[in-house]
Each structure stands twice: as C-alpha cells, then as structure tokens.
Swiss-Prot record:
Its main location: membrane. It comes from the Bacteria. The chain crosses the membrane at residues 1-21, 42-62, 71-91, 103-123. This is UPF0344 protein SH1980. NCBIfam families: PRK13673.1-2, PRK13673.1-6. Belongs to the UPF0344 family. It is a multi-pass membrane protein. GO terms for cellular component: plasma membrane. The keyword Manganese does not apply.
Length: 133
C-alpha cells in the first residue's frame, strides 16, 4: 500500500504541473486539459484513499504497542488534504484568468512540507534507514 501511495502522489504532482501549464492565460484551457484534469482528480482520490488507509494502519499499530507519532501523522494528513484543495483552487483560478501563481507556489511549498513529513514518519525512508519504526 505504501508503494501505491508513493506512486499515486508522484503521478499527482506531475499531472498537476502539466494540467496547470495547459491553461493559457489568453486562450484558456487547451484541448488536452480536460483529460488531464480528470486523470489528476483520479490520482488525487487514489492518493487520499491510500494515505487514509496508511494512517489507519499506523494508528492500529500504535494501539497494539508499536509505532506512535500521532501528531505528525495527523499533521501530514491535514497537509495532504490542503495540497489537494490548493491544487483544485489554483487550477480553477487559472481557468477563470485570475491570479494563480501565488497559489501555485503555495501548493509546491506545501507539497515539499508534506513530503518532508512523510520522509521522517515511521514508514518513511529515513526511519527505515536508521531502523526506527
């Protein structure tokens, strides 16, 4: 499940950047925008569902004596939901020809924060590198 989550958010980020760039400031969305947006939404849902499933698994492991870090897990969940919301809002604003570059960069910064939290959490690469779980 962890690999599916990582693959889904990686594809979500790539699709977000491509979809954002497929909206021209003067002409609006290109013909490829609609399928890109639909694929982006599918991968957003897949990312949210797999992340929620990983959260449940970690909470269950913590209740049986292993794991922990409930606060960081909850913060990562909230950041993930905020990333998805910012992706949708920035694309909607760009389609309406409103200022959206600030939201785009806020989304990128929040993606980096969310990924950083994922790296240091119990199933992340840093934790497995040092045998912390």
């Amino acid at each position: 499940m962890l690999h599916m989550h990582i693959a889904s958010w990686a594809l979500t980020i790539i699709l977000y950047v491509i979809a954002f760039l497929h909206i021209s400031k003067s002409q609006g969305p290109t013909p490829m925008f609609k399928p890109l947006q639909m694929a982006l939404r599918v991968f957003m849902l897949l990312t949210l569902f797999s992340g929620f499933w990983l959260l449940i698994q970690e909470f269950m492991a913590a209740s049986h004596g292993g794991g922990g870090n409930h606060m960081l897990l909850t913060l990562k969940m909230l950041c993930g939901i905020a990333v998805v919301a910012l992706m949708e809002v920035s694309i909607a604003k760009r389609k309406k020809h409103e200022a959206s570059h600030g939201l785009f960069w806020a989304t990128i910064i929040l993606i980096i924060i969310t990924m950083s939290l994922g790296i240091i959490l119990p199933w992340g690469p840093i934790s497995s590198l040092f045998g912390i779980s």
